């Protein structure tokens, strides 16, 4: 059933993690400590973590009834992107199976991280821990950062700074401040994708009591200014 879960884990969003990872690999290809096999292990871990967190987002959204709220809003004439887990509501999979799929993807990511940790040392553990907490807390746990106006910031940190400095350290065993600076720019680009969705869904998010950066900004003028 692996293909089923890969297909439902929003693989269309994978460029958001793969492209920054490849960019970091290209930036780290010159140092003497560069390792291609470490790059492959790290890339596999990043992909599995991304898919796992996408499915975790589905799991937590299902728990709070996100689909029901959006369907009700569409019925009232408001624009609301429909739910992300038709495979659950249609009976193709159960919530328990979804939870297990999340565990499998994230477990593979952790194994990849432990391999890199063994060869590169404790900084990788710190990056993994921060990424794990942010990934789960985006829509789950007590924080639910994506529901309180911090979703765009979380995405920018995870897919920009953490991903790129983690990948570079994995392939080279060193940190480069040039990569750190570039990772901030990449994070802002990825953040723009999420922010654009929040601008389009601002009315639906307001009705569903979901706070996003677009809602924090308020006026259309401020929203467009931030997008620029």
Feature map (PLM): residue ranges:
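Membrane-embedded alpha-helical segments that form the functional core of polytopic membrane enzymes
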Residues: 22, 32-56, 125-133, 176-196
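Membrane-interface elements of multi-pass transporters and channels
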Residues: 29-34, 59-63, 122, 140-148, ...
